[in-house]
């Protein structure tokens, strides 16, 4: 993964394989998402007491917050197999039929990016979720015949980063829905402390807090930064990750105190220094930093918006006072009401 992707919440296949060794195995080990954990605990205990699979579960929220981990934990707690697939992998209804008819009783089926499932497959899923059967259509036109196939009772765990793209009929068939929120710094520090123990890394409390503060509220990013800081500590120091070591390491990787990377800061600096804080159009802003508009909109803007550094208006993008402050610049308003910038001086 390139340095520019160091604070991206997306994960490569190699990183997902590495994450497997850090994933919690039980709800008690899972850090953060307190309400969701409590609700899932009650639901799973009730299902075990009844001897039946729990309701279908829909988990929504940004990537890297633990949706896959929770699906794995559910199967572990229920002591049943887990089968994993994704919406893009199911291109035809037949693909889904093959998966559903192969499920064992009580099995947990994890369907990542469920909002991207093909419509014919989605419609087939309705009956499977409600009645544990699928209707296979043989032939075409008036002579087509529907053959019902039984499906073993199962629990579907759907995960989505874009719940607004789910159709109403699909969303309504989930008995339990939960939204995963970003983590606070204390929760991320606990995640880092646990991961450091599993990786054999000596991490001080101050070092954990420093990495947590730059992790954008996302455990996946926190663990990724921890690995880079560990490398620095082993090569340039005595192997102990302190606050100073974390700061020095992340300075090399261009991750600043808020978790902004090179692209984030380039966008923010262009908006503030070249366009006086805005408003400026997306295309113009993207050209000024040598990127495509889609890259700026999809990669840089979401965190800048969430961090309160940028706002979108009908006239274009604008920097907030917090953006000027973060860059060490002082917003100055001239008599015409236009915002200009000047560097802070030591005498101010």
UniProtKB/Swiss-Prot annotation:
Primary location group: cytoplasm
Region (Small ATPAse domain (RuvB-S)): 184-254
Binding-site list for DNA: 312, 317
Enzyme class: hydrolase
GO CC, alphabetical: cytoplasm; Holliday junction resolvase complex
UniProt EC number: 3.6.4.-
Molecular function per GO: ATP binding; ATP hydrolysis activity; four-way junction DNA binding; four-way junction helicase activity
Comment block on domains: Has 3 domains, the large (RuvB-L) and small ATPase (RuvB-S) domains and the C-terminal head (RuvB-H) domain. The head domain binds DNA, while the ATPase domains jointly bind ATP, ADP or are empty depending on the state of the subunit in the translocation cycle. During a single DNA translocation step the structure of each domain remains the same, but their relative positions change.
Function: The RuvA-RuvB-RuvC complex processes Holliday junction (HJ) DNA during genetic recombination and DNA repair, while the RuvA-RuvB complex plays an important role in the rescue of blocked DNA replication forks via replication fork reversal (RFR). RuvA specifically binds to HJ cruciform DNA, conferring on it an open structure. The RuvB hexamer acts as an ATP-dependent pump, pulling dsDNA into and through the RuvAB complex. RuvB forms 2 homohexamers on either side of HJ DNA bound by 1 or 2 RuvA tetramers; 4 subunits per hexamer contact DNA at a time.
Family statement drawn from the similarity comment of this UniProt entry: Belongs to the RuvB family.
Protein name: Holliday junction branch migration complex subunit RuvB
Protein's organism: Frankia casuarinae (strain DSM 45818 / CECT 9043 / HFP020203 / CcI3)
Lineage, opening ranks: Bacteria, Bacillati, Actinomycetota, Actinomycetes, Frankiales
